[in-house]
């Protein structure tokens, strides 16, 4: 199921692969976010050419926007979307708990009010697993509570305990799955920013022995130093035999630091989101295409990129599209940023294989200032 090909000599970075029902996924792996079964503005063909073998979709949004019965009629999310690669489906818990005034938690699940039409719903840990089983998800994520930075210890302790209980009931559901379904369950560790809670959460989750482990509840507004502290602390408690997934990170500097600490999988919608403001990822840092200096610029965004934008169009033309709020500009910029992320991951893999990860990481981070990103 999971194999490591090469460990970095000096750090915890590693290269390997994960065998899933719809094909092999190489690690480290950046997972693009296709909330409703597709990336905004991008054809599946773009991702297929990039050899993207794992996309994230969101159970909460699919449940509210589409409905489980529709997916069931199509015999799964893969058939419905005509995506023949792997899906990881998040429970949507982060989204539910972000609406603090629209939800109520109990020991079995969460009552919430739809942000779309005001209808009332109830998610349980068992129900979330059943939905993702209907989806045919290749990786299932359980219901969990992603608590915000700055809450007190007692509240964090309560949410950690509830998350562990939900993980246990989800794990039991996974043992009674329908015949022929081979999706992997990755259980989520929580604990907010209290190390004793993190340690207890990880130990409790490890006792269940799920195929993979996710670190949740970081990169939620905390200072970068606190993020790195909890990331390193959590990593040291997770056995190397398990694939490790940090939820909700995806900017280049966060990815490089996560890989440094031995993280294998990450996701983020940031590469697509920043295109709304005309921000492009390049080897020389963030390019803000809306600046006046690019108005008459006939050159390409990046010479060594083979995306549609860089093969055909100028910086000046893209600036015109973005400033005019033309959808085509967002599509071109999104494709470029996704190309960039996959190219970056490929370079990182090569650096690890060549025992050059330290030099690569150091030189790369010099080009990217923290203020250029909004994680």
From Swiss-Prot:
GO terms for molecular function: metal ion binding; tRNA-guanosine(34) queuine transglycosylase activity. Gene3D superfamilies: Queuine tRNA-ribosyltransferase-like (3.20.20.105). It catalyses: 7-aminomethyl-7-carbaguanine + guanosine(34) in tRNA = 7-aminomethyl-7-carbaguanosine(34) in tRNA + guanine. Substrate binds at residues 90-94, 144, 190, 217. Pfam families: TGT. GO terms for biological process: queuosine biosynthetic process; tRNA wobble guanine modification; tRNA-guanine transglycosylation. Keywords: Glycosyltransferase, Metal-binding, Queuosine biosynthesis, Transferase, tRNA processing, Zinc. InterPro entries: ArchSynthase1/Queuine_TRR, TGT, TGT-like_sf, tRNA_ribo_trans-like. Residues 248-254, 272-276 are annotated as: RNA binding. It comes from the Bacteria. Its cofactor is Zn(2+). Its EC number is 2.4.2.29. The active site is at residues 90, 267. Pathway: tRNA modification; tRNA-queuosine biosynthesis. Zn(2+) binds at residues 305, 307, 310, 336. GO terms for cellular component: cytoplasm. Binds 1 zinc ion per subunit. Belongs to the queuine tRNA-ribosyltransferase family. Homodimer. Within each dimer, one monomer is responsible for RNA recognition and catalysis, while the other monomer binds to the replacement base PreQ1. Catalyzes the base-exchange of a guanine (G) residue with the queuine precursor 7-aminomethyl-7-deazaguanine (PreQ1) at position 34 (anticodon wobble position) in tRNAs with GU(N) anticodons (tRNA-Asp, -Asn, -His and -Tyr). Catalysis occurs through a double-displacement mechanism. The nucleophile active site attacks the C1' of nucleotide 34 to detach the guanine base from the RNA, forming a covalent enzyme-RNA intermediate. The proton acceptor active site deprotonates the incoming PreQ1, allowing a nucleophilic attack on the C1' of the ribose to form the product. This is Queuine tRNA-ribosyltransferase. The gene is tgt.
